[in-house]
């Protein structure tokens, strides 16, 4: 089940296909600009400098002993191991991560980092490893509604239903978009995503829309009460390297492929969500 949830990063179709094409073009362009030797240094020293903002659990945070822990931290360790290195974490405020990368203070940024097309002149992005987009959630065992994979299309699934959302969030915007095409769809705004999911469990709403991170956190804390049935939007998390660290960028993508194929990424998702 967790494996299938992780693979939902690929269900968005068009958006992620365009992203993968853009990433491939970016890497091809970078190949004509030479390599800065970062991969050689990483392998020679056995150290991969990883920039992150350790204030975003469960992706990255500090434990009581000051150690960096979380999904991204474990991903960095697994990725570094495939490069025959150990990660050296550099804790930086999120707004300073790109500057640190471009100033050669870190080799990669692994920090719940969304793909940003405006940055592709300066950095190479990896393939996505997590989709933090908006998802549709139902109560577990709700026999009145049928989830993804059924023959019931989305308009019929939600017609005449109430959907809980965090007011003013991307989920709220997505619900407003759905209301334009789904008859009698009502929204139930809540102060936070967690409260929107709580309203679903309490029976105040028939469904909820929230970002995937909030949903996975809620599912972890409330085992068996809700189920994710549809990915509605894509917000891929990616790893960034400098534009001239093209060999390192390729090694990162190769490592991610290996971690995905080996089931390591699924195992990390199960551990942290």
Where are these regions (language model features)?
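Extracytoplasmic small-molecule ligand-binding "clamshell" domains
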Residues: 11, 32-112, 121
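Ligand-binding clefts/hinges and TM-proximal coupling segments of bilobed small-molecule sensing domains
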Residues: 23-36, 168-188, 226-228, 257-273
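Short helix-initiation/N-cap motifs at beta->coil->alpha
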Residues: 36, 89-99, 149-152, 187-198, ...
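Alpha-to-beta junction loops
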Residues: 48-49, 84-86, 102-111, 161, ...
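Ligand-binding cleft/hinge of the Venus flytrap
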Residues: 60-63, 76-85, 155-157, 171-189, ...
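A ligand-binding cleft/hinge motif common to bilobed small-molecule-binding domains
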Residues: 95-99, 113-122, 176-178, 199-233
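Periplasmic-binding protein-like
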Residues: 131-138, 212, 216-257, 273
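Flexible hinge/capping segments at coil-to-helix
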Residues: 139-163
């Amino acid at each position: 089940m967790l494996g299938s949830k992780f693979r939902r990063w690929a269900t968005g179709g068009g958006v992620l296909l365009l992203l993968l094409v853009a990433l491939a073009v970016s890497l091809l362009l970078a190949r004509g600009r030479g390599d800065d030797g970062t991969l050689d240094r990483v392998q020679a020293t056995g150290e991969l400098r990883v920039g992150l903002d350790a204030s975003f659990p469960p992706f990255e945070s500090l434990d009581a002993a000051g150690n960096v822990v979380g999904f991204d931290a474990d991903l960095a360790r697994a990725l570094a191991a495939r490069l025959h290195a150990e990660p050296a974490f550099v804790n930086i405020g999120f707004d300073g991560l790109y500057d640190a990368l471009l100033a050669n203070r870190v080799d990669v940024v692994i920090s719940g980092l969304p793909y940003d097309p405006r940055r592709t002149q300066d950095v190479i992005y990896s393939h996505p490893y997590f989709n933090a987009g908006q998802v549709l959630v139902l109560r577990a065992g709700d026999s009145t509604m049928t989830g993804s994979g059924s023959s019931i299309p989305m308009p019929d699934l939600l017609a005449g239903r109430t959907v809980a959302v965090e007011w003013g969030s991307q989920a709220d915007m997505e619900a407003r978009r759905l209301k334009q095409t789904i008859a009698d769809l009502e929204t139930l705004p809540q102060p936070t995503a967690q409260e929107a999911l709580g309203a679903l469990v309490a029976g105040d709403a028939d469904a909820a829309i929230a970002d995937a991170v909030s949903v996975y956190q809620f599912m972890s804390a409330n085992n068996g009460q809700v189920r994710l049935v549809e990915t509605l939007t894509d917000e891929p998390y990616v790893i960034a390297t400098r534009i001239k660290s093209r060999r390192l960028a390729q090694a990162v993508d190769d490592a991610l492929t290996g971690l995905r194929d080996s089931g390591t990424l699924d195992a990390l998702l199960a551990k942290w969500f």
